[in-house]
C-alpha cells in the first residue's frame, strides 16, 4: 500500500476530486495548508522582520494499493495542472498498514 499526498491549488480541488471519484477513488482526506516552493518563496518584511510569504494550498491524502499508484498520480497530475509555477507537488510514500476503526479490519481490505 502507498500513501499519496498531493498539494494543489485551492481552485483545482473540485476538478481533482471529480476526476478521482470518476476513477473509483472516493476515500480521501482534504486539508487546507500553507506553503512555499522554490519559485513562490518570496521574502517580505514587516516592521523590520523578514519572513517568507506562504501561499494557500489544498492537501489531498489518498491511500491506494500498490498497483493503482501510477494511475492515481496521473489522474491528480492531469486534473491539477495549471501550467504555471506553484501548481503543486505529489509525494508517494510506503504505507505499512491501515485499520478501519469501526470494524477493526486492516490491510488493503480497508482501502
Give the predicted meaning of each segment.
Residues 1-111:
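Positively charged, small/polar-rich N-terminal and surface patches that mediate targeting and assembly
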